[in-house]
Amino acid sequence: MPIVRFIRSLLLFLFFIVYTAPYATACFIAFPFMNAERRYWMAVGWCRSTLFVARHLAGIRYRIEGQENLPDGPAVLLSKHQSAWETVAFPAIMPRPLCYVFKRELLYVPFFGWALGMLKMVHIDRKEGKYAFASVVKQGRLRMKEGAWVIMFPEGTRTRVGQQGKYKTGGARFAIDAGAPVVPIAHNAGHVWPRNSFIKYAGTVTVSIGKPIDSTGLTPDQLNARVEAWIEAEMRRIDPHAYRDAGGGASASSGKAGKRGGGDRADTSLG
């Protein structure tokens, strides 16, 4: 019922307000006495708590397909982007530390940005101009040598359920320059945690992890095309009702799904 859904969403929102600030404060106090890996896993504790509370308050569950496809070595994860859910959930469900690529401006966001600045992530400084990408590659290589996986969202912005954004080549370029394979990821989180909506919906998110794509000998356009083809085909498999044309390109979703999850302007890709 709508009123029950609203109450659950409100309780989840209050959880974020009440829980995030003290957790971030605890991180600030503890981080100076921890190495980078322990800092990361302490921060991931917040993500795990969020998934636990989202499950019991809002009925949001998830299942993972293809987890055996995750490699033992360095990798670049390129994922579909529909929701804030995947940003929170992926660190909690992946067996290795994840290194997000984000705009430097996010470091100045209270609590979230401050904690982010104490973790080993990759940041983009647009003021560096043409040297920005080289800086990202340098940071990413170092993080992968330390055992992390670099993760990006090639569409850059969160797309509506049933729609396909333009896949930018930055993630593919990074993987080629770093000499790492790409692991494509599809999911349908936009149904339960829609963008631009206070209301959350009960349901199960399917996260599908594809086999690694070797970047050796490929151009950025070729690698990007393979990633896009796999993700979009997989989206139509795990969420067929959201696409009016299962074999076509970008399409709007119909019915209730189409009303959830608008786009945003937070660029999370590289050119």
Regions found by a protein language model. Give the residues of each.
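Catalytic core of membrane glycerolipid acyltransferases/transacylases, capturing the structured
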Residues: 24-45, 55-57, 72-129
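N-terminal membrane-anchoring alpha-helices
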Residues: 1-63
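Glycine-rich helix-loop-beta junction characteristic of Rossmann-like nucleotide cofactor-binding loops
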Residues: 66-70
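Non-catalytic C-terminal accessory region of glycerolipid acyltransferases
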Residues: 3-6, 133-271
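Thr-Gly-centered strand-to-loop micro-motif
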Residues: 65, 101-103, 124-126, 154, ...
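Generic preference for hydrophobic
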Residues: 64, 77, 100, 207-209
